[in-house]
């Protein structure tokens, strides 16, 4: 069901409020450039600093703007199981195609706790669920054996966004758990596709969707020579997206390009002048500004 490039979109702000017109403009730009779907209110969408009301309004707006043209994956994770259920049910009710559900962060559940958490979410909705593993942010690693148990027990647990850079774990996940894997790290998209992954939930695709779609399509077709050419062309941009905490660099880049992005919400803050210069040079080298 999941294949290709899914930009994890930013949430643009204007005068400290969500810029819904800018959001619509960004979504249309991404769809026009061939993405497979839109991932709303994930980490890149500054979900931690959106109110519940804003979170829900953004999902509703994304579903409305997309209007069935591509898939909508709604961020619906939480470190509180009941809250994750509430957000997932809401996403289903307003017409999202799937939910992205992160491993609970900070409270560090065991593997059994993760199994029970995701099981409760899966029981609450009929939508496909994309599990999200990002140990660098959550302090917990969703192990392949846990994913295998979940996928065997719940038919709507359909995919994993894997942002653990350990390719040995990715291999186990694809081979043993037999579940669709989407890269959660732009730099590792090609290695993960080579192992059998089906695509990427991407930050960089906010900036260069057409090129990223071309790269992934070449890789999925087995033409890794052409895919590598694009990978290495975009590699400096991939690196630049993480010179400060995501989504600081991607929003800064979009602002430099004159695209809707706006300010960040504290505790995220404006990029340092030193890093701005690095990012500006990368964008200039690619002809983006």
From Swiss-Prot:
<dbReference type="InterPro" id="IPR020624">
    <property type="entry name" value="Schiff_base-form_aldolases_CS"/>
</dbReference>
<feature type="active site" description="Proton donor/acceptor">
    <location>
        <position position="132"/>
    </location>
</feature>
<feature type="binding site">
    <location>
        <position position="44"/>
    </location>
    <ligand>
        <name>pyruvate</name>
    </ligand>
</feature>
<feature type="active site" description="Schiff-base intermediate with substrate">
    <location>
        <position position="161"/>
    </location>
</feature>
<dbReference type="GO" id="GO:0008675">
    <property type="term" value="F:2-dehydro-3-deoxy-phosphogluconate aldolase activity"/>
</dbReference>
<dbReference type="InterPro" id="IPR013785">
    <property type="entry name" value="Aldolase_TIM"/>
</dbReference>
<keyword id="KW-0963">Cytoplasm</keyword>
<dbReference type="InterPro" id="IPR020625">
    <property type="entry name" value="Schiff_base-form_aldolases_AS"/>
</dbReference>
<dbReference type="GO" id="GO:0009089">
    <property type="term" value="P:lysine biosynthetic process via diaminopimelate"/>
</dbReference>
<keyword id="KW-0457">Lysine biosynthesis</keyword>
<keyword id="KW-0220">Diaminopimelate biosynthesis</keyword>
<dbReference type="InterPro" id="IPR005263">
    <property type="entry name" value="DapA"/>
</dbReference>
<dbReference type="Pfam" id="PF00701">
    <property type="entry name" value="DHDPS"/>
</dbReference>
<comment type="similarity">
    <text>Belongs to the DapA family.</text>
</comment>
<comment type="subunit">
    <text>Homotetramer; dimer of dimers.</text>
</comment>
<comment type="pathway">
    <text>Amino-acid biosynthesis; L-lysine biosynthesis via DAP pathway; (S)-tetrahydrodipicolinate from L-aspartate: step 3/4.</text>
</comment>
<keyword id="KW-0456">Lyase</keyword>
<dbReference type="GO" id="GO:0008840">
    <property type="term" value="F:4-hydroxy-tetrahydrodipicolinate synthase activity"/>
</dbReference>
<dbReference type="GO" id="GO:0019877">
    <property type="term" value="P:diaminopimelate biosynthetic process"/>
</dbReference>
<keyword id="KW-0028">Amino-acid biosynthesis</keyword>
<protein>
    <recommendedName>
        <fullName>4-hydroxy-tetrahydrodipicolinate synthase</fullName>
        <ecNumber>4.3.3.7</ecNumber>
    </recommendedName>
</protein>
<comment type="function">
    <text>Catalyzes the condensation of (S)-aspartate-beta-semialdehyde [(S)-ASA] and pyruvate to 4-hydroxy-tetrahydrodipicolinate (HTPA).</text>
</comment>
<feature type="binding site">
    <location>
        <position position="201"/>
    </location>
    <ligand>
        <name>pyruvate</name>
    </ligand>
</feature>
<keyword id="KW-0704">Schiff base</keyword>
<feature type="site" description="Part of a proton relay during catalysis">
    <location>
        <position position="106"/>
    </location>
</feature>
<dbReference type="InterPro" id="IPR002220">
    <property type="entry name" value="DapA-like"/>
</dbReference>
<dbReference type="GO" id="GO:0005737">
    <property type="term" value="C:cytoplasm"/>
</dbReference>
<feature type="site" description="Part of a proton relay during catalysis">
    <location>
        <position position="43"/>
    </location>
</feature>
